[in-house]
């Protein structure tokens, strides 16, 4: 089993370009990605991937702007109802829909999926972007960890960060 793989991103390339050179069409599953640099288009890569996705981002402005730029995408955060999410899922059931959410909005997606009888754990890929925020922000934003209760139940998943927290070595 492979535990560590490096994909080099050349000057002028995006994350998707490096993946394609390595024979991957989109973000691999069941991995933790340290992309080293922000702004390489990893989230864009998932937004254009031919699969149903839940993308967790730490901030509302990011999910709003990304959802506006992509078809079959819905931003889920405070003020978006479970009914709206369920309606979106019904309308896009046969498409590669993208649900962008804050960690706090994840529960709405979970409830909407249950309401329309979609098994999110088998039908969707989940990407936790800026996953370092789980550790950095939990002391003042306890609900940021809520999606982790479900994360490992997904068959297809990935954590990604340009600024991961490196564990301290034991002395």
Residue ranges, per PLM feature:
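Walker A/P-loop
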Residues: 21, 25-48
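SF2 helicase catalytic motif II
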Residues: 103-106, 114-159
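Well-ordered, non-membrane alpha-helical segments in soluble/globular domains
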Residues: 13-22, 82-86, 108-115, 140-148
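Inter-Walker segment of RecA-like/P-loop motor cores
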Residues: 71-115
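Short glycine/proline-enriched coil/turn segments at helix->beta-strand junctions
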Residues: 29-32, 48-54, 68-73, 122, ...
């Amino acid at each position: 089993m492979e535990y560590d793989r490096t994909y080099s991103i050349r000057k002028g390339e995006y994350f998707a370009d490096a993946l394609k050179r390595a024979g991957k069409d989109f973000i691999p599953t069941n991995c933790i990605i340290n992309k080293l640099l922000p702004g390489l288009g990893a989230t864009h890569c998932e937004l254009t991937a031919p699969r149903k996705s839940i993308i967790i981002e730490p901030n509302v402005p990011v999910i709003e702007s990304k959802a506006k730029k992509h078809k079959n995408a819905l931003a889920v955060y405070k003020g978006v109802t479970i009914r709206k999410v369920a309606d979106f899922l019904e309308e896009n059931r046969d498409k590669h829909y993208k649900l962008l959410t804050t960690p706090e909005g994840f529960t709405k997606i979970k409830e909407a999926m249950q309401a329309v009888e979609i098994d999110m754990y088998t039908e969707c890929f989940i990407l936790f972007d800026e996953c370092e925020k789980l550790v950095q922000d939990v002391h003042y934003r306890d609900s940021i960890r809520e999606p982790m209760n479900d994360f490992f139940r997904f068959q297809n998943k990935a954590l990604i960060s340009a600024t991961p927290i490196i564990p301290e070595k034991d002395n």
